Regions:
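N-terminal auxiliary interaction/assembly segments of multi-subunit proteins
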Residues: 1-228
């Protein structure tokens, strides 16, 4: 028996499908699982892969920061760029100690604001070495404010950070760093909504026997120019 339909049979079948007289595979929704609805505006679904251009920027920043930081504290310090992390703002803030030097900046012409985070270990060690110490004295990160001397060190570190950030971005685009304000308590330093995704670029600063860190924190949406 010939399994090929005649043209009249094909026409009748198409007419039945269009009018609903003939069931199609897509008509049967019983017994199957319902379709999942995806929110394509959810950043967690669209954040994928690495940011190779940002890795290069961070390497440039680390080299420049090392040179200037060595000159500033008159000691040998090794500075390296760590692995970039993409996480929620709330997850980043909840893991910070108090006090932490949290400094909010604009990076013009990029949209939004960014965060330069200096951990207290970096600040305390740099101050000790600057005044002739070894940087190896034990210290406790307490819930206290920074001293005037420690704040002066923070400002000096921020100055060289801003300059080297501008130079590191130079081959990609011209930027200007605009300081806005500083905080010590993480709950006052959210630069985006708590559940928004941020990009954390850790810069590791190794003294002899001690390690501190600078984090450059930017909203994921800010980095459109360097995603490709």
């Amino acid at each position: 028996m010939d399994d090929i339909l005649s043209q009249d049979e094909v026409d009748a079948l198409l007419k039945g499908m269009g009018g609903g007289d003939v069931e199609t595979e897509g008509d049967d929704t019983s017994g199957g699982q319902s379709a999942k609805v995806y929110d394509f505006t959810n950043q967690e679904r669209i954040v994928r892969g690495r940011l190779p251009a940002l890795d290069i920027i961070n390497e440039r920043f680390a080299r420049g920061f090392q040179r200037h930081f060595n000159e500033m504290i008159m000691a040998s310090v090794e500075v390296t760029a760590g692995e970039v992390k993409i996480i929620k703002m709330i997850d980043y803030l909840r893991n910070l100690f108090v006090p932490t030097s949290l400094n909010i900046y604009r990076i013009n012409p990029l949209n939004g604001v960014s965060l330069f985070t200096l951990d207290s270990k970096l600040i305390f060690t740099a101050v000790d070495i600057y005044f002739g110490g070894t940087g190896l004295l034990p210290f406790k990160i307490e819930g206290r404010e920074y001293t005037p001397v420690e704040m002066s060190m923070v400002r000096s570190i921020l100055d060289i950070s801003s300059e080297n950030m501008r130079k590191a971005w130079g081959p990609v685009m011209d930027i200007e760093i605009e300081y806005m304000h500083s905080e010590m308590n993480p709950k006052f330093a959210g630069i985006v909504d708590p559940t928004d995704m941020i990009v954390v670029s850790p810069i590791n600063v190794r003294f002899e026997g001690v390690e501190g860190r600078v984090d450059i924190v930017m909203p994921y949406a800010m980095l459109e120019p360097v995603r490709d």
